[in-house]
Amino acid sequence: MGQELSQHERYVEQLKQALKTRGVKVKYADLLKFFDFVKDTCPWFPQEGTIDIKRWRRVGDCFQDYYNTFGPEKVPVTAFSYWNLIKELIDKKEVNPQVMAAVAQTEEILKSNSQTDLTKTSQNPDLDLISLDSDDEGAKSSSLQDKGLSSTKKPKRFPVLLTAQTSKDPEDPNPSEVDWDGLEDEAAKYHNPDWPPFLTRPPPYNKATPSAPTVMAVVNPKEELKEKIAQLEEQIKLEELHQALISKLQKLKTGNETVTHPDTAGGLSRTPHWPGQHIPKGKCCASREKEEQIPKDIFPVTETVDGQGQAWRHHNGFDFAVIKELKTAASQYGATAPYTLAIVESVADNWLTPTDWNTLVRAVLSGGDHLLWKSEFFENCRDTAKRNQQAGNGWDFDMLTGSGNYSSTDAQMQYDPGLFAQIQAAATKAWRKLPVKGDPGASLTGVKQGPDEPFADFVHRLITTAGRIFGSAEAGVDYVKQLAYENANPACQAAIRPYRKKTDLTGYIRLCSDIGPSYQQGLAMAAAFSGQTVKDFLNNKNKEKGGCCFKCGKKGHFAKNCHEHAHNNAEPKVPGLCPRCKRGKHWANECKSKTDNQGNPIPPHQGNGWRGQPQAPKQAYGAVSFVPANKNNPFQSLPEPPQEVQDWTSVPPPTQY
């Protein structure tokens, strides 16, 4: 018995070193459950007596069939992980002599007796890494009694792959006399094609006894349940630690205290699985720090994969910057604006449960819009449920709306990806049915250029806002051009005004490219020196080139536009008594009297006065008639006497002509 125990310890130590080379730490309780599961699903495996990749894949196929038939509840959570671990050991046994020796030794044990009674009790707790139990529980119980072991310890069960040599084989040598180098050479013969094949007869089958042991050790259900609980608690602790480390790493990289997607940053994000992929799924707990900071009602569902290939679903926090941007867009541009719908579609790419959608809409939209969206969403879910019923699909109205038996978040997290897609389609369709409220263009008219803001930046903000409202800036280019002039600062308006109807928006930008802070500062100083505002100074700047007003003498306007003419124009002076004639109230230069009020003649005006029309003289002075008086003259028809010769005289010239 001492030799058997020493041989077993040496084999366990060898297997421990083989696993250590792979960097894997195996637990006793997990491996024990795995061996029990292999025994239940594959009772033929220990009877064949050969361990190769082909037979081990048959074991994996049995696992998959068992999983498809009974579901994930009947399969241990570590079954597939340990199967992959042992598969890697079998694949690497040709390059690792230590693994090759362990596999060869196990094959010898299986060939010698498939129902060997072995005990595994290690005095050193550090060596208690892998369960190596026997299929014969009755023989095992007797061996335990012979060794004087305590009956309170749980009896061991059947080893699947890695077993120690039996103590009942009379041909087993002493472990101290075993040539381990020779054993490695013998194990290498199994896979060397140049050597002759190593043929052995298969172990005889005992038809009188069944393949599985008839007498099983009594297992306490409470103890087994406690082991499962302890295993789950340890899994939860490791997952929490994993999430906390990823969150801390993200904070160190970005310097931001709020970590939106730690799984993505840590490289653990996974593409969503489509229906039909048989992967065990569960829910892992999030970090306690996140639970205190962010409520659980507004998280999308994400799925991550741990190091063992298991998928876990949990809630991951929204990026609150996206939610804030969505609320701002819905308030400024409207719930159905193209920019707002683009944000909604980006958020809808996640797996959102009906509770998540309801919470998101209630936080972003007003109370009335939330009720409108909810009514449209329920109507869309009814139509989708009818189509699912006609197609034979079990996704009903309660699952789509998250009501009834599916009102809890835990139940909604386990939805299939196809169901999440139907919920997304119904929610986004209901969002598009929301009515347009207010004037969307009001936010566009509120975009004004700052005093020191470059005109190009102002136009960019204007075009961006127009694109969010109209869907494309080209749709409202004329409206944008008008607002680019009206909402510009006075300096840019003065530069654009002469060319306003001669160029387009790009011309506006080119005209205002030189207007910057220094130009604005000089313009303000010039306006202050002239005693005018900047706007008045720019309006009067081009008018000063026309000269001064002829009436008031000031610059900036003409005489016809002079506002001071009406104030300075006094009433006309009334003439008094005429100084020449003393008989009327009129100006002296307008007096036409010949005599004054005493009857004395008034001398004529000296100098050039107002002249009338010239008149012909009534009498010819100094003229001599040379026509003789002749009665036969045909031109003389007037019966008047002929004129006499007149003398020359001197008279003053007429005063007027």
UniProtKB/Swiss-Prot annotation:
Keywords: Capsid protein, Coiled coil, Host-virus interaction, Lipoprotein, Metal-binding, Myristate, Phosphoprotein, Repeat, Viral budding, Viral budding via the host ESCRT complexes, Viral matrix protein, Viral nucleoprotein, Viral release from host cell, Virion, Zinc, Zinc-finger. It holds the Pfam family Gag_p10. SUPFAM superfamilies: Retroviral matrix proteins, Retrovirus capsid dimerization domain-like, Retrovirus capsid protein, N-terminal core domain, Retrovirus zinc finger-like domains. GO terms for cellular component: host cell cytoplasm; viral nucleocapsid. Residues 113-178, 592-657 are annotated as: Disordered. InterPro entries: B_retro_matrix, B_retro_matrix_sf, Gag_p24_C, Primate_lentivir_Gag_pol-like, Retrov_capsid_C, Retrov_capsid_N, Retrovr_matrix, Znf_CCHC. A lipid is attached at G2 (N-myristoyl glycine). Residues 101-161 form a propeptide. Residues 216-257 form a coiled coil. The keyword Transferase does not apply. This is Gag polyprotein. It comes from Mason-Pfizer monkey virus. The lineage of its organism: Viruses, Riboviria, Pararnavirae, Artverviricota, Revtraviricetes. The gene is gag.
